[in-house]
Structures are given as C-alpha cells and as structure tokens.
C-alpha cells in the first residue's frame, strides 16, 4: 500500500520494523530447533528452546503489547516507539537469550546420536532446489543463495546488511544449522539496529492509492519469501490482491526429501521444512 500511495515510512519506523521481523525469525527458528530435538527424543534442547522461544516472543510483546507483533505496523510506519527504557530492556533481554540459545543449541551439534539422525536425512541437492524453486532456509540449506533481505533489500536492510547463511548438504542437519547461523545474524542485526536507532517520526500520512496500478512486494519471512501482489481499479480501490506464502514453493521440496527415507525420518524432514497448510492454500 505504501508503494501504491507513493510514500516511504520514516527511517525510525523502518528500523523498528526490521527489529520486529528479526525477533519473529528468532522465536520461530529457536522453536523449530527445539521441535527437531524433540523429534529425535533429545529432551534437553527441546525443553530449553521451548522456554527460550517465549523469551523472544516476550521481546515482541515489549515492543507493541502482543507476543506475535500484532498491531505494531501500520500503513506509513509503525504504531509504537522504542524509547530509552524499552531499548535498554531489549538489549538486556537479548544478551540473556543469546547466551541461553547458544547453550541449548550447541548441545545438538555435540550429540553423536542427534547428528546420526540429522545427517544424510531428507537430502535436496542445489540443482533440485533451484529447479523446484525452493525459498528460505530450505533453499539456503541446499546451497542456493536466495534471500529477499540481500536480493531486494528494503527498509532497515538497506542500512544494515544481514549476511546470507548457506550450507551445501541439503539434509535435515543443514536446514537446522542454517537456522542456527541465522539466529546469530538476527541477534547481531537487532543489537546494531537498537544501538543506531534514529530519531524522528514514526509514521507519515497516507494519500489516496494510485488508480489502475500493480505493485509486487517481497519480504523475507522466517520460512522464506513472502510475496504480496496488489492491483487497483480506476478509483484506486483494490481490484485484486494475492499473497504467496513460502509453503507454496517448498511443499514439493518436502515431498522429494521424503523419497527413500525411513518412516521414522518423516517427523524430522517435516519439521525441518515446517510448512504451513494455511499458507499453501492462500
């Protein structure tokens, strides 16, 4: 809508949006790693990550009063500011969560029984990943460099670069390990954004939308590329609106990853993609 209205959110709003997006990524990546640990019966990491995921969700609640970040953004900017006390609280919580996350997740890589289940399970080659159009961590775990934050940087990602994390083996381990690498990058990004948070307005006014126009918007969600397409009619009202979730692109990847696998490997492969039924049907 901002593109259709020919406006840009203020710099401070863009920073806050970036922080919120990476907090969402942190909560879900940590939750996924905990679930993968649970699927192989490794309860220490499964239990720790369940609690740590809540820590990241509570940071989102500190931003806007909702653990899932609802009502934070608005057309033209954001609804909530990050003042001094909130900033200091976020930095303190982030440091504690970073330490706890590292302790919990590194247990996985140090466990031979976990690694024997993760490695070589559900392989997707880079060639296949490219042919079927995988996106997000699933694509990057197969060595396919594809990330909206790098390929089409917008908002806060124009000011602060997030390194793209890839792995080459394309198995359950790779999809788990890419999440761990991205967790570390997201924490560094949030810390940098908080320390360099600019002053200024939180939002701008929104004029009428351009008539008879089409806009394509891309965001790198925690599952991968999210695409919104909007078309307006002659009066500037929506004529068509379509959302494409990462699950739409990645479901065939899960199907291919399961070929030739043991039945006991299904939960691992399934959770390593962690797709959305509702997202696929959008």
Question: What do these predicted ranges mean?
Answer:
Residues 1-282:
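Active-site bordering "gate/hinge" segments
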